[in-house]
């Protein structure tokens, strides 16, 4: 019998958007063009055209003891070449940003190999070999996962995800890494992800707009689609909460099942 992944519960558009993000067979809509050179500038790990720094020789040149797991798992290109590990970190506004931290974590783990990801309330970091990171970052920035106004590339001083948007719909950024170009109607980055000034601004394109964000967001909100309106999602969350509360704190809830498992009838 074949198994089809369900990814996440829910019957609303929010749940469907989450499933699209996680489903590797779903192709993200490309919404903007960011050159490789501009992306490297915003990441701030190396200069455009600079070689990748390495932390060990290419795997083909190294001697290893026999390891069946290593033989079974194909290394990603950066690992093959010994390239160092680097990161990109996003902050997502709670005002209907396309993605949010837990959605990002699940999406990264379903879609990409060789990743390490960390989830906090208002930011999400993805770490991997720098060579592979740039390719993944390009997809994350050029597609529907990213909105220049409500998604921020922030390697440090990430605060702002829960603050009100400004008059141009931009999420607050204490380091002012990006500004709104009123002539073009575009968001442009004037600093890299840790706040170092760029020689030239990087154009990230036009903000998506409030109506479009409400359609594609993965965030439940009372003023859009409330989680209370998603019966299946609530049911699953309540089941998990009940099981963790009653079972996790003991209270003899699962004692009969435990005795059976231990063979003590």
Curated annotation (Swiss-Prot):
It catalyses: coenzyme B + methyl-coenzyme M = methane + coenzyme M-coenzyme B heterodisulfide. One of its GO terms (biological process) is methanogenesis. It is an enzyme of class 2 (transferase). Pathway: One-carbon metabolism; methyl-coenzyme M reduction; methane from methyl-coenzyme M: step 1/1. Pfam families: MCR_gamma (PF02240). InterPro entries: Me_CoM_Rdtase_Fd-like_fold, Me_CoM_Rdtase_gsu, Me_CoM_Rdtase_gsu_sf. GO terms for molecular function: coenzyme-B sulfoethylthiotransferase activity. Binds 2 coenzyme F430 non-covalently per MCR complex. Coenzyme F430 is a yellow nickel porphinoid. Keywords: Methanogenesis, Transferase. Its cofactor is coenzyme F430. Coenzyme M binds at residue 123. Its EC number is 2.8.4.1. Signal peptide: none annotated. Belongs to the methyl-coenzyme M reductase gamma subunit family. NCBIfam families: met_CoM_red_gam. Component of the methyl-coenzyme M reductase (MCR) I that catalyzes the reductive cleavage of methyl-coenzyme M (CoM-S-CH3 or 2-(methylthio)ethanesulfonate) using coenzyme B (CoB or 7-mercaptoheptanoylthreonine phosphate) as reductant which results in the production of methane and the mixed heterodisulfide of CoB and CoM (CoM-S-S-CoB). This is the final step in methanogenesis. MCR is a hexamer of two alpha, two beta, and two gamma chains, forming a dimer of heterotrimers. This is Methyl-coenzyme M reductase II subunit gamma. The gene is mrtG.
């Amino acid at each position: 019998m074949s198994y089809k992944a369900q990814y996440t519960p829910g019957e609303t558009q929010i749940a469907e958007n989450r499933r699209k993000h996680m489903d590797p067979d779903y192709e993200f809509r490309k919404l903007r063009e960011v050159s490789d050179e501009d992306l490297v500038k915003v990441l701030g790990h190396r200069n455009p055209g600079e070689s990748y720094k390495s932390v060990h020789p290419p795997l083909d040149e190294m001697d290893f003891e026999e390891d069946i797991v290593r033989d079974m798992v194909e290394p990603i290109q950066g690992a093959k070449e010994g390239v160092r590990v680097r990161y990109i970190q996003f902050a997502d506004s709670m005002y209907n940003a396309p993605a949010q931290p837990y959605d990002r974590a699940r999406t990264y783990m379903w879609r990409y190999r060789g990743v390490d990801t960390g989830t906090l309330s208002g930011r999400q970091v993805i770490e991997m070999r720098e060579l592979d990171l740039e390719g993944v970052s390009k997809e994350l920035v050029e597609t529907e996962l990213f909105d220049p106004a409500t998604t921020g590339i922030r390697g440090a001083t990430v605060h702002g995800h829960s603050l009100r948007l400004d008059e141009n719909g931009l999420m607050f950024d204490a380091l002012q890494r990006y500004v709104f170009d009123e002539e073009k109607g575009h968001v442009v980055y004037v600093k890299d992800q840790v706040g170092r000034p760029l020689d030239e601004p990087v154009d990230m394109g036009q903000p998506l707009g409030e109506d479009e964000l409400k359609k594609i967001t993965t965030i439940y909100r009372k003023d859009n689609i409330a989680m209370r309106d998603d019966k299946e999602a609530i049911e699953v969350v309540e089941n998990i909460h009940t099981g963790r509360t009653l079972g996790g704190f003991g209270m003899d809830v699962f004692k009969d099942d435990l005795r059976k498992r231990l063979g003590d009838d």
